[in-house]
Amino acid sequence: MIRKSIVLLSIALGIITLWSCGSEAGTEQQSVEDNQEAVVEEVQVETEDTEEADFIIPSALQIHTIFKSSGLKYIDGITNAPDNTSKYLSKFEKLLNFGVYSADMFYCVLNDQTQLSTQYLKSIRTLSDETGMSGIFNSAPILERFEANIGNKDSVISIMLEFQEKTDVLIAENNEEHTAMVIFTGAWLEGMYIGLDAARNSDNEMLRERLIEQMTILPNLIKGLDIQPNKNDQTKDLQAKIVALSDYFGSIEGLKGEDEYSYDVSVLETSHFQEFYKQVSAMRNEITKSKV
């Protein structure tokens, strides 16, 4: 049996003064570059595959930080409703939406929607209790500290970084790295859903470039779902849809550059982003059980 490596990537922000009302996208991007430190933890997953592979999975906070610095604005009502937790019955659904709600929480925090972000943290706590991850909240009063610091953005983001770290540590300590892949898949789909909703009707080239960079994670999502133990129809169906999205992305003529991570975004038309959105939103709405 071969071990596959998953790299859990969390972002530690130094001086969190990135999102003041008067900031320009370019200034915010420089602030991110100056003040972030990547903390990488490598963990192991047992798998039956005959080859080793590394999975790089950025945090939901990192994804939204990248999109925010690229000019993504807050869209009221686009996130998953916090009271939808009762809709999710299987552990797979709960873990996916743990990721969805994590993405929504960070999106709200970075856009000064602190009251709504508190509701998302409560939804995450509900799902963590139902999936055996209550230790994230039991080890420290994260929710209580979050509510007490609701008016201090720097403190709130620091608490969110602590939440991300505790999630990663708990998963690693319990050898549940395959769980991390399901959570990240939900977070990735939600982040891309929000970003593509803006990009499909916008000429924001920086945002579009960042979205294409995130599309390169698709092979890791596919592999991450492939290593799931006791895969059921839900897992296989979602994996098949992500494969279809990856195939469409790879079929766009002239997009792939000379090396693995080189892409010519100039060949993309608005119709391509509309198709990306169509496929991502279909998956997102299915896993969140949202009405179209």
Write out the residue ranges for each language-model feature.
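Bacterial N-terminal signal peptides that target proteins for export
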Residues: 1-9
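C-terminal motif of bacterial Sec signal peptides marking the signal peptidase cleavage site
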Residues: 17-20
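Bacterial signal peptide processing site
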Residues: 22-25
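N-terminal Sec/ER secretory leader and immediately downstream segment
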Residues: 31-144
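Non-transmembrane, amphipathic alpha-helical segments
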Residues: 86, 90-93, 105-112, 116, ...
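Secondary-structure edge/capping motif, primarily at the C-terminal ends of alpha-helices
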Residues: 105-112, 131, 171-174, 195-203, ...
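Extended amphipathic alpha-helical interaction segments
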Residues: 152-235
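A cross-kingdom marker for long, charged
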Residues: 226-292
